[in-house]
Amino acid sequence: MGQTGKKSEKGPVCWRKRVKSEYMALRQLKKFRRADEVKSMFNTNRQKIMERTEILNQEWKQRRIQPVHIMTTVSSLRGTRECSVTSDLDFPKQVIPLKTLTAVASVPIMYSWSPLQQNFMVEDETVLHNIPYMGDEVLDQDGTFIEELIKNYDGKVHGDRECGFINDEIFVELVNALAQYSDYEDDEDGDDNQDDEQDDTAKDQDDNMEDKETQPLRKFPSDKIFEAISSMFPDKGTSEELKEKYKELTEQQLPGALPPECTPNIDGPNAKSVQREQSLHSFHTLFCRPCFKYDCFLHPFHATPNTYKRKNNEAANDGKPCGPHCYQLLEGAREFAAALTAERIKTPPKRPSGRRRGRLPNNTSRPSTPTVNVSEAKDTDSDREAGTETGGESNDKEEEEKKDETSSSSEANSRCQTPIKMKPNIEPPENVEWSGAEASLFRVLIGTYYDNFCAIARLIGTKTCRQVYEFRVKESSIISPVIAEDVDTPPRKKKRKHRLWAAHCRKIQLKKDGSSNHVYNYQPCDHPRQPCDSSCPCVIAQNFCEKFCQCSSECQNRFPGCRCKAQCNTKQCPCYLAVRECDPDLCLTCGAADHWDSKNVSCKNCSIQRGSKKHLLLAPSDVAGWGIFINDTVQKNEFISEYCGEIISQDEADRRGKVYDKYMCSFLFNLNNDFVVDATRKGNKIRFANHSVNPNCYAKVMMVNGDHRIGIFAKRAIQTGEELFFDYRYSQADALKYVGIEREMEIP
């Protein structure tokens, strides 16, 4: 019977009771601790106020205070009334003239809002933070509104069910408190089995050091604790999830602990030698490619690193030694670099037609490192490769004549940029130590500069190109292979590319004709080395592939930009026709790629991304509440401002819209089928533009560098001082409900 009672004390019911009691004790302790903190802060602030008051009193005693002269009434003035102030004390009676102020009209009601200059993505609010006050009239008309509003949030209201609240701090303290019960029970079990463990005492003494190292692992709380907490708080996850959460929280509390997947600073004293992916993890995680900045508030996702190499000649190796100790003078160095290039471009290295310096004879050349002409190993789109074959023989003769010459230069730095002709160097490799920062930086740069070891050495700054080359040879089996470049098929000509794109655009347009209102949010496709077919998310959403997609630049679904030489403000421009702004990375001839600070841009289809807004003034409107007035003269179809605000989901917009309808004031604006712009809490001044069935402005949703943005444009010529209106697209009933006054028609 005793054993049965002992087992029942350790059962799940007992653990649930312990969780409840410890949780209530922690909540009570936290409440008392919070009260003590508030009391301590109150006393501290009160003491500071008293000290400051005493200082001010001492200053006032030292100052000379001028007496206040009591104004005497002027009885000769008509309409003058007197106001007297008397006191029961011995103070003299004060008589002053009474002036009546004229009535001033009150300003319209305005709810508080935060100014924004760009859109701001926010998460859905699944908990109702506060029950809005609607007034007695609204509640009398619709008494069930508050109940329906709470149902939209699944009955979750901030502050309810306080007893079921558990945050990370309470969770860790609760587990630590329950761990004491588990340790006590383990000690009891250890006493019962003490006789059985005496035979292993000698073995335990031999492994004493190992036991000390593994002691933190054995002190980890029992699974019973997490199972009991999971049963008491099922919304916090399963026992395994709680266990992982406890590990993360306790590791973060350790002194000097780094966040998960965090690499020490490459410039710090604790720099480690890690792989390229680990060094660039923070960059790829925090850097937003569309916004080109860190910690972006607009894009909740971040695209994976682009696997396609840019077609430029920035990292090309010119094939000339950088100094008397350059790695290219080593025996077999050129062949090694050529083999790397040949492996990267997926084409077998070609044997040069003429003889060259440092070339091995045919009978001694190794098949694993065939010789390759440096000009052939460079990028295929280099403009400097055009004349490599024309002067080949003369260059070979000059190299043969100068093969045995030595340089008179005394430059010993291999990072020098002056080309020097030298003999092949067959010195043994240097034994140089590489720090963790240098090794990590090398692995990052090798993915960009490939076999250009001279450029890598200049960027590292502490190693010569020969040392970089030798380190690259040593790391050949460790460094992950570079993704091969597709150069088997030559790139299409621009005319043919635009012709194919025009045919593809007509297909897309035919699909959109049946459902023109379906506009979906763009997300970059991520299926590298795979064509954009019917499984591509861009094709499914009927969106064009953008420059942020992982597909090839020759993708048929990728928007190529325009080649206009005019202002791009007619349907002759492909970008204007597709309701897009010209992309400065794609549209290189229309002026969209001009200097960013330039005010006079020839392209008129890039105003939103450049922020070329007009000067707007806020003042009371004759129609309803506040209105927005323009301080500049605007021509027809000219950009005025962008409609900015919080970007919320359609579900969140439905929940907020029910509250806004009761207030009869809404700033919701549909962006696409996925998101809505809400300028109620955050926005810019254009949010005050009123509705009209005869507006002088119109709104247009445009694709701007992969993002849908709302632009407000002039529907006709607008003069300085006019109030701005655009059509909210209300139904007839809503228009009468929300906008009671229609402005008078103005004759232009």
Curated annotation (Swiss-Prot):
One of its GO terms (molecular function) is histone H3K27 methyltransferase activity. Residues 362-374 have a biased composition (Polar residues). GO terms for cellular component: ESC/E(Z) complex; nucleus. Residues 347-359 have a biased composition (Basic residues). It is found in: Nucleus. This is Histone-lysine N-methyltransferase EZH2. The keyword Repeat does not apply. Residues 200-220, 376-387 have a biased composition (Basic and acidic residues). Residues 505-607 form the CXC domain. Its EC number is 2.1.1.356. Polycomb group (PcG) protein. Catalytic subunit of the prc2/eed-ezh2 complex, which methylates 'Lys-9' and 'Lys-27' of histone H3, leading to transcriptional repression of the affected target gene. May repress transcription of the egr2 and en2 genes. May regulate the circadian clock via histone methylation at the promoter of the circadian genes. Residues 184-199 have a biased composition (Acidic residues).
